[in-house]
Every structure is written in C-alpha cells, then in structure tokens.
C-alpha cells in the first residue's frame, strides 16, 4: 500500500510543515515573548525594532529552508507510484474495524476544528463564571474597550477590503488559470510566508517613488495576491471541463472570442466563480500576517482588532476580543455559505 500512497503522504506532510513553519497569527497571539519563531522574529525586527536588515536575513533564511524541504520531498517522490494494483474488493461488513477507524479519524478532525470555535463563543458569553452579554452589547453599541476604533468601523473596513480583494482576485484568476506558466508564477504565495511578504512590502513601498506603505488600498491588493493561488485552483478544473465543441460551435455561428466567453464560458463557470469569490473574501477577512505590517489606525481589520484586544489586560477587554472573534467566524461562514 505504501508505494501507492507515499506521494500523497509526502505532499501532505510537506504542506503541514510549510503551514506550521510559516505560521504567524497563532504564534503572535499565543506564543508571547518566550515562544518565538522565525516568522514572529521577522515581525519583531521589522515593525517593532525597525531593523529591516536582520528581518530580511531571517526571511531569506526561511525561504531557503522551505525551498530545501520542497526539493527534498520532490526528490523522494516515486515516479511509478501512480500505477495501482487492483485487488479483489472485500466487504467491510466482515471487518468492522475498517469502518470504525476512519470514523474515529473523522470525528477527531471535526473535534479539533470545532473545539476552538465553540470555545471562542463560550468565552464571549462567560465572564467570572457567569453568563454575560456585555461584550456583545459593547460590540453592537459600536464601542470596543481599550481601542481607539469602533466595532462598526472595524467590521466595515474588513468587509470593504474583502469585497475589493474579491473584485481584484477573481477576474485575475480567470485570466491566469488559462496558462500553466502563469499558474506556477502566481502560486508562489502558497510557499511564501506572511512575514516574508510583509518585509518585502516594507522594503518596496517605504520610500519614493513607491511610498505606498500607509495607503489603505494596498491591503486589499495584498489580500488578493495571497488568495490568488487558491482562487486559481477553484477555477481551473471548471475551465478545463468546458467542452471545446461548445466553443467551436459558437465560433462557427460567427461569435467573437469575447462573445463566446460571455455566452458559453461564463454560464458554465458561474458556480466556480461564486466559490472563488467566497473563498477570496474569506481569506481576506481572516488575513492577519501581511496586514500586521501595513495596518494603520484607519485600516484596522477584524483579525488586527482581535489580536489587540486579546493582547491587553482586563477581563472585559479580552471578552470583547472573544466576542469579536466569534462574530468574525459568523461573518466568514455567512460569506462562504452565500457563495
């Protein structure tokens, strides 16, 4: 069995390593001073200490390690692993353990994913071991304790950025998904960490003639860049599934390539476009790493506000942070379900 699944296991392990090695939000909120990673140290050196040279060196070191891991795992893949040996199917009824084991894995995965979300909602409703809606009342009244921005401003900013990111990302994904070379180029954000992207933004847009680091419009653009690889993967299978005969028939009837695209491609791609729109908006709503390098007082998003609230002392302040986190989960789920 191992030769048949080795490539899939190695690919999955590589993705897990990359996502853990480049994790920033969890470390920034829960790690504190005693638990620093390369990612959090890049942020500390670049933003808090202003030492872009050290931050750049760490970012380059991180990129080298990621490239080395990708190279090693690619070399270990088995070229003949796709040839499967078909055996006689066996009934699962005679071996109940084969049904129980996958079910246990699924239940464990659901529990691991759902527990933090349920705990967030619970903490937003409980203060000093008693049920309290004070955090939710403060959010819906428009005020956030210990912050200079209102909850309405934070929510509005996040939604505007998410819509703008989707408007940039989805059309670009439709264009890029047609070319394999472009797909490879625009897939780089998958293996480039948020801190590396952030330090690159600081270096590139911190001086004339491109002194755009404090511009609000740069944040949704970066969100679109981060979401683009996943949007391409959501759109590409639908584009490949369009029958070429439909396009040929449209061209035979005298339709131009643009009319063919509007009348043939777009109706078929509509479900994929909606999924890509919801996906890009969800990624924008939850993006924390690169936004931390660019956020200003007038561009505070939901993840930034949550991190600021949870990082301040006070039971009421932290409960407001949990309530805002629960609200972000509801907004994200709503966006994805509508898409």
Regions found by a protein language model. Name each.
Residues 1-22, 103-114, 188, 225, ...:
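Transmembrane alpha-helices
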Residues 94-105, 175-201, 247:
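Cytoplasmic-entry segments and transmembrane alpha-helices of multi-pass inner-membrane transporters
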Residues 1-66, 239, 248-253, 259-261, ...:
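Hydrophobic alpha-helical bundles that form the membrane domains of multi-pass transporters
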Residues 27-34, 87-91, 126, 133, ...:
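Membrane-interfacial helix termini and adjacent extracytoplasmic/periplasmic loops
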Residues 63, 67-70, 91-119, 184:
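N-terminal signal-anchor/first transmembrane alpha helix
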